[in-house]
Structure formats: C-alpha cells, structure tokens
C-alpha cells in the first residue's frame, strides 16, 4: 500500500543553476493545488540537518520564476554523505511531518535522496545542473541559460579577437563534462573545442591548425576550452610562443551559473516540478525525473546513477567539419 503523502519538502542542493526557482515555484504551487502542505528546506541537506525548515505558501513563490539562483539557498554537506547524517536527516523529516522531499540538484544530490528513500522518506529528484552531465536525461535545469550566458561573453571576446587578429582561448564550465563547451563551440564557430571526454587532445595539432588557418587567410582563432581541461592561461603562453600570434585566455567562471533563466529553462523546470509532485502522489519514490525524446519520464535513482553519458560523437565531428 502506497504511503499517504500529506506534507512534502523541497530543497536545492549542490551548485546553483538558473531555473531552480521555477522548479521550486512549480513544486510549491502544484502541491498546494493538490491539497498538500509544503515545507521549504534552506541550504540543501545542510539546512535539513540544521532544521532550517519553513512553511511555504503560494505567495512565497510569487515573482521568482524569472530570478536566477535559488531562493532556498544551497550548500554542499559532507555530513550527509555519512550514514549517521542521513539517519539524522530522515528523523528530522519525520519530526517535521515531512512525508516526501523533492530534491533539485545533480548526481550527488540524487545519492542523498536515495539514502532518505531507504530510510522511509519518499524522494523525487529533479536534474538541476548547468553541466548537462546526468545520463538519464537530455535536459537539465540551467544548461540552456548557461550556454546562452557563455555565448554572449564568447561573442564579445570574438569581436575583440577579430579586431586585434589574436588567438583567444575561452574557458567555460564543465569539470567532467564538455557539453557547454561543445554547444558553445558549434554555435560560435570556434576553430577548436577542448573537452574532458577527449582529454588526449594534442596541443601541437592546435598550434598547427592555427598556423594553417592563418596561411589560409583566417585572421583570428577561437578555442573553447572546458574547465576539465583547464590551464588556459599557460596554454595561451605556449601557443603564443610557438606561433608568434598574440594569444589571450578568458575564464568565464561563475557568471555561467547566474542570471535570469531562459524561457526554455523556466518552461522545462516548471513542468518537471509539477511532474515530481504528481508521481510522488502516485506512490513513487526513489525516482528521478528526466526528459527524453520529447517526453518527461522518470527512472529509479540507482538505475539513473549507473547510466553513462558520453559526448555526442557526431556533434563533435561536425564541430571539426565547420571549423575549416
């Protein structure tokens, strides 16, 4: 018999992502519309352990859909990685009458949700990460905004790079996943794209490419470098020394996490938030919401965590075809 759900909690965990507020809003309003009470848990799992728990009404999420970041705050919590911390979190949920929690975050957040589910708290995970590195879904909350934010900056760097006939290395986020770099590189027309999934790149090939392109009349060269490759500043020095072409590195950093979410991030986050509440009311737990082939779906958390997501080889090939 499915556990009766009367009160749900919602938290954001790990790195913030534009669109998290849209998801929070959807969870709160859908739950209230379905006759549930809602508790907001501040600062992720750390806030749960600290009992930073507030009642939430529909008015509390007014005018947040367009805001970046997360109104609940977020934090990383080492204590919650341990069994004692997880047990404490489940006990606090029961103390506050929380029957289920919607967790918005990445893989690490899912593991925390999985632990709570094993301890009797219904949990549903939503993919909140700008990196698009969750294998069970083609979309993650914040990715589209991060790409658009990075693109605006890259376009500006490209303008000045062209004016000064420079080589420019622009480093974007993606410690273990190169999806932002690949998407931006293709959309910007970059000459080279460096991805963590292709870590065996040859720097001499890049240098040769720059020299060849200059001989063919290209007056500037754009390299999009994922954070997982890194070392953009030292790479710029080596390229300039080898080619004699002025080379500059620009590291975009945390600006990619901020800003008002795009229409796509607002829309998808809203649908996912509502979907999470509804599948919880169906009695589902230990699930994560994803988007595949035009549909919103859900997976067992363990199944989702075991999936592997590689870079799209055809898209990577196209990036080379278009860079000549």
Task: Label the model's feature ranges.
Residues 39, 117-140, 194-198, 251:
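Short, acidic/small-residue loops that bind anionic groups at enzyme active sites
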Residues 287-324:
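Phosphate-binding loop/pocket of nucleotide- and phosphate-handling active sites
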Residues 2-49:
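N-terminal phosphate-binding or glycine-rich loops at protein starts, especially the Walker A/P-loop
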Residues 17-27, 49, 83-84, 100-114, ...:
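Short glycine/serine/threonine-rich phosphate/pyrophosphate-binding segments
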Residues 103-105, 115, 122, 143-246, ...:
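Accessory alpha-helical/coil subdomains and C-terminal extensions
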Residues 2, 48-101, 108, 141-148, ...:
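Glycine-rich oxoanion-binding loops at beta->alpha junctions
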Residues 136-147, 260-266:
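Short beta-strand elements at the ligand-binding edges of bilobed clamshell
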């Amino acid at each position: 018999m499915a556990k009766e759900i009367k009160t749900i909690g919602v938290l954001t965990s790990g790195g913030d992502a534009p669109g998290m507020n849209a998801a929070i809003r959807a969870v709160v309003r859908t739950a209230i519309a379905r006759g549930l009470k809602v508790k907001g848990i501040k600062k992720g799992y750390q806030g749960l352990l600290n009992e930073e728990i507030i009642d939430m009404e529909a008015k509390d999420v007014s005018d947040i859909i367009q805001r970046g970041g997360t109104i609940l705050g977020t934090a990383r919590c080492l204590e919650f990685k341990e069994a004692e911390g997880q047990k404490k979190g489940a006990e606090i949920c029961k103390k506050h009458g929380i029957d289920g929690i919607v967790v918005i975050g990445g893989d690490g957040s899912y593991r925390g949700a999985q632990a709570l589910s094993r301890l009797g708290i219904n949990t549903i995970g939503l993919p909140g990460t700008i990196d698009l590195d969750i294998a069970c879904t083609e979309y993650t909350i914040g990715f589209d905004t991060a790409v658009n934010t990075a693109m605006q900056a890259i376009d500006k760097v490209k303008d000045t790079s062209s004016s000064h006939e420079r080589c420019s290395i622009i480093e974007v986020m993606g410690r273990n996943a190169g999806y932002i770099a690949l998407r931006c590189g293709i959309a910007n027309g970059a000459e080279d794209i460096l991805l963590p999934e292709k870590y065996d790149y040859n720097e001499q090939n890049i240098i040769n490419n720059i020299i060849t392109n200059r001989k063919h009349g290209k007056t500037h060269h754009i390299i999009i470098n994922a954070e997982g490759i890194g070392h953009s500043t030292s790479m710029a020095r080596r390229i300039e020394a080898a080619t004699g072409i002025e080379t500059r590195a620009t590291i975009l950093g945390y600006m990619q996490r901020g800003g008002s979410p795009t229409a796509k991030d607002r829309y998808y986050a809203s649908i996912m938030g509502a979907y999470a509440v509804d599948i919880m009311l169906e009695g589902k737990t230990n699930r994560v919401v994803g988007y595949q082939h035009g549909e919103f779906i859900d997976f067992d958390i363990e199944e989702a965590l075991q999936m592997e997501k590689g870079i799209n080889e055809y898209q990577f090939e196209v990036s080379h075809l278009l860079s000549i």
